[in-house]
Regions:
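Alpha/beta catalytic barrel-like cores
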Residues: 1-114, 123-134, 144-145, 149-152
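Conserved, mostly hydrophobic/aromatic
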Residues: 118
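Eukaryote-skewed repeat-based solenoidal scaffolds used as protein-protein interaction platforms
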Residues: 134, 140-179
Length: 179
């Protein structure tokens, strides 16, 4: 059995509350993000800075997981905020982001840590709304890209769980859309 957890390491995210660190200790988290208004005003360069900080901390979290015997980790879906609005190569820090992600992936692969992700409920492949389906493809592609940057195997061992959600009044039609 592999012991693990989903997304937020409470001890690292809140080191003074759940850990043994003094006040003022910086949290380690991959959940940094921004609201749309901030993205619109600060742009892709700020998204790059956030993504880089998240990638560095993913490495720190993976190191902590290995040192503490956690062999399963479900990654955040928010590693790269507003990723559907830009391409990876638009990020000024993409080279360093990829290096940190690869380092985290190497740590996981070397120590047998199973890494998965679970994109949010707004990703709906069976939606009758083509925009929703297209956005879902973009988001799932982003998750796959991150796994590729990490060097994770493309197997069931490193899953990207997806929501099927809703039949929209016609189960057969929804199944056809999904399959």
């Amino acid at each position: 059995m592999k012991l693990g957890y989903a997304c937020i390491n409470m001890q690292l995210s809140y080191p003074t509350k759940y850990g043994d660190k003094p006040k003022g200790t910086e949290s380690i988290t991959t959940g940094r993000s921004m609201i749309k208004r901030t993205f619109e005003s600060k742009g892709v360069d700020y998204a790059s800075e956030i993504t880089l900080a998240n990638a560095k901390d993913l490495h720190n979290i993976m190191t902590w997981n290995v040192l503490n015997g956690y062999n399963f980790y479900r990654m955040t879906s928010g590693l790269a905020p507003w990723k559907t609005e830009y391409e990876w190569n638009d990020l000024k820090d993409i080279k360093e982001i990829k290096q940190w992600l690869h380092s985290a992936g190497t740590m996981a692969n070397t120590h047998g840590v199973r890494v998965t992700s679970h994109p949010g409920p707004f990703n709906v492949l069976v939606s009758p709304n083509e925009n929703v389906v297209e956005n879902t493809f973009q988001d799932l592609t982003m998750h796959g890209d991150v796994f590729d940057f990490m060097g994770l195997s493309r197997t069931h061992y490193n899953k990207i769980n997806i929501h099927c959600n809703g039949v929209y009044g016609d189960k057969e039609f929804a199944m056809d859309r999904f399959c």
